[in-house]
């Protein structure tokens, strides 16, 4: 059985970041049960696609680190008005990407890797612009790593292919729930 857990990794990252910050509102951060399940499925897809456990772990770790850092910045009020507009745009693009991924998963023969890859690339670019003055170049590299990995047309084609049907179903279930709850 796989011992990797995105939830425990997220909690470790939260603790590390929060140990350097003050304020209780920062304590309620990123990961809930549904998000954890989606991240775990993304990990499994990455591991099967790349045939590399360390590479799959690295991309999910990078995703969690970036998400926690952006959440901390947002909750700490570090974003100015123009950056809050970028944050709204990022959330809209991410939501659009999730709805597109769901649509491709639910309606046969509609999948187009270029469309989903394009949406993920747009998300990456908006997020990089948002955190440009707040995070280090190392964090910018993590953002590029995560979005470049998941916008890879080969990975997307495999995900929507017959070998990954079970993973895609679980990811779509999680995305649907996150959208319904307004968390995406």
Swiss-Prot record:
Any one annotated GO CC term: nucleus
Database matches in Pfam families: DUF758
Phosphoserine PTM positions: 3
Location in or out of the cell: Cytoplasm; Nucleus; Lysosome
GO biological process terms on file: innate immune response; negative regulation of inflammatory response; negative regulation of T cell activation; regulation of apoptotic process; T cell activation
PTM annotation, UniProt: Phosphorylated by TAK1/MAP3K7; this phosphorylation triggers association with BTRC and subsequent ubiquitination and degradation.
Keyword terms: Cytoplasm, Immunity, Innate immunity, Lysosome, Nucleus, Phosphoprotein, Ubl conjugation
Keyword Ubl conjugation applies: yes
InterPro entries: TNFAIP8-like, TNFAIP8_sf
The keyword Phosphoprotein appears for this protein: yes
Domain notes: The central region was initially thought to constitute a DED (death effector) domain. However, 3D-structure data reveal a previously uncharacterized fold that is different from the predicted fold of a DED (death effector) domain. It consists of a large, hydrophobic central cavity that is poised for cofactor binding.
Main function: Acts as a negative regulator of innate and adaptive immunity by maintaining immune homeostasis. Plays a regulatory role in the Toll-like signaling pathway by determining the strength of LPS-induced signaling and gene expression. Inhibits TCR-mediated T-cell activation and negatively regulate T-cell function to prevent hyperresponsiveness. Also inhibits autolysosome formation via negatively modulating MTOR activation by interacting with RAC1 and promoting the disassociation of the RAC1-MTOR complex.
Family, similarity comment: Belongs to the TNFAIP8 family. TNFAIP8L2 subfamily.
The protein's assembly and partners: May interact with CASP8; however, such result is unclear since could not reproduce the interaction with CASP8. Interacts with RAC1.
Cited PANTHER family: TUMOR NECROSIS FACTOR ALPHA-INDUCED PROTEIN 8-LIKE PROTEIN 2, TUMOR NECROSIS FACTOR INDUCED PROTEIN
Protein name per its UniProtKB record: Tumor necrosis factor alpha-induced protein 8-like protein 2
Originating organism: Oryctolagus cuniculus
């Amino acid at each position: 059985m796989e011992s990797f857990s995105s939830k425990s990794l997220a909690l470790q990252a939260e603790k590390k970041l929060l140990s350097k910050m003050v304020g209780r509102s920062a304590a309620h951060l990123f990961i809930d049960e549904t998000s954890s399940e989606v991240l775990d499925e993304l990990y499994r897809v990455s591991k099967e696609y790349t045939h590399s456990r360390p590479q799959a772990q690295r991309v999910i770790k990078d995703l969690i680190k970036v998400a926690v850092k952006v959440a901390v910045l947002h909750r700490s009020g570090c974003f100015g008005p123009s950056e809050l507009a970028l944050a709204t745009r990022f959330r809209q693009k991410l939501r659009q990407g999730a709805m597109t991924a769901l649509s491709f998963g639910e309606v046969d023969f509609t999948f187009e890797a270029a469309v989903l890859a394009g949406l993920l690339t747009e998300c990456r670019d908006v997020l990089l612009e948002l955190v440009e003055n707040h995070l280090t170049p190392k964090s910018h590299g993590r953002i590029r790593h995560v979005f470049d990995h998941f916008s890879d047309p080969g990975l997307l084609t495999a995900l929507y292919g017959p070998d990954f049907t079970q993973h895609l179903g679980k990811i779509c279930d999680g995305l649907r729930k996150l959208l319904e709850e307004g968390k995406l």
